[in-house]
Amino acid sequence: MPRQSAARLHRVISAERRTAEACFGAFEFARDVAKLLRVMPPSPHPLRFTRAEFAGAFGDLGTDLPLLVGIVVATGMDATTAFVVFGALQIASGLAYRLPMPVQPLKAMAAIAIAGKLAPPLLAAGGLIVGVVMLILARSGALEWIARTVPKPVVRGIQVGLGLQLAMLALTRFMPADGARGWLLAAVALVIILALRTSHRVPAALVVLALGLVAAALTWPAGAPLPLGVRLPTLPARWPTPNEFAQAALLLALPQLALSLGNSVLATKQVVADLFPEREPLSVKRIGTTYAFMNLLAAPLGGIPVCHGSGGIAGHYAFGARTGASGIIYGTFLVLSGLLLVGEPAAFQRLFPGPILGTLLLVEAITVLLLVRDLRDTPAWLAFAVACGLGAAFLPYGYAVVLLGGTVISAALRRRTRQTVPI
């Protein structure tokens, strides 16, 4: 018996040592990536690890977790690697920007990959292609030209479209989960958020997440094991073939780039200016460059394609995040989740009930939608932005249509009415 106990103790210590080494490696990787992403001088703004930052860190969980788990389950890619790389990029973004600058799954690619159950190398090829294209646009100055050409009402319209899509996702997919019980849980979570929206002592998001964990514990299937253990990341089995690169260019990269230009670059720059007017303005060149480097790093390591996003900033901000500490906290959570994630990834998702994720997502959607209010002094352009938002949300390739068509129409309207579009 003593010999067996010693063997068990040795196995536990070995597992803990491997976990600690993997965590240290992930943080070293994140620090190196942050140095690479910091294409401007270091920010003087400090990181604040407060309760509000901890709460705001999970403000984008309702968007990220379903897409991340959905991609892993549909494509069969290694869950540990996907979570660890995704978390390390969150940490790197927080260190580089010193803002709650989110790292999110590429939404158009995620939807196509989940629907088509694409192979991981095809998804990696798509991430590499958008990374190369965005890097060329950023470093050539093309992004600055696009930013000067696309007027503010079109950018606001893209945000309205994103807000509508996020709200519909929350209301039609996540909140109705578990039927009437799910709606009740979502209603309780929403009441908590409204009641604590101005509280700095008790952050609403942390209370809502705790509520979700309690609900998950009460409804956990009898006899079902917890998806916990220790696993280490692995590198992809193979590199994409030339044929997969060609497929990915048409199937994945083309639909994604229009959405990325509108939401990940232009709208993100605008939201940072809206929510952090006291901070130095971000350039589209910097945002595009970090977008590119993240994908060029993630794909070879077995991570999912990623981007920045205006909705993610709004979600983190709505729940209290004001510095890059929120990204470091969130990234640490994701890295640890990846290292401790075993078995079916969908089981891990059960720890965060759909109605809870839906409530967080709905708050994020409302925050994004309310950004259009700054056009209320020009009713014509407000109506134009709302029309652009409806087109972005409901038309096929809506973001590309609005980005191109909205810019052309707004230019024609300005010439005809001699009005200046607010910038």
Question: Across the structure, where does each feature detected by a protein language model lie?
Answer:
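Hydrophobic, membrane-inserted alpha-helices
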Residues: 63-69, 86-90, 107-112, 186-193, ...
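Transmembrane helix-boundary motif of multi-pass solute transporters/channels
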Residues: 55-117
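Membrane-embedded alpha-helical modules
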Residues: 116-224, 329-423
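Membrane-embedded helical hairpins/re-entrant loop segments and their flanking transmembrane helices
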Residues: 37-54, 70-92, 254-324
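Transmembrane helix boundary and interhelical junction motifs in multipass membrane proteins
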Residues: 62-68, 102-109, 265-267, 303-312, ...
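Short, amphipathic, aromatic/basic-enriched membrane-interface segments that mark the entry/exit
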Residues: 50-57, 73-77, 94-100, 173-181, ...
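Helix-loop-helix junctions that connect adjacent transmembrane segments
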Residues: 202, 206, 213-260, 267
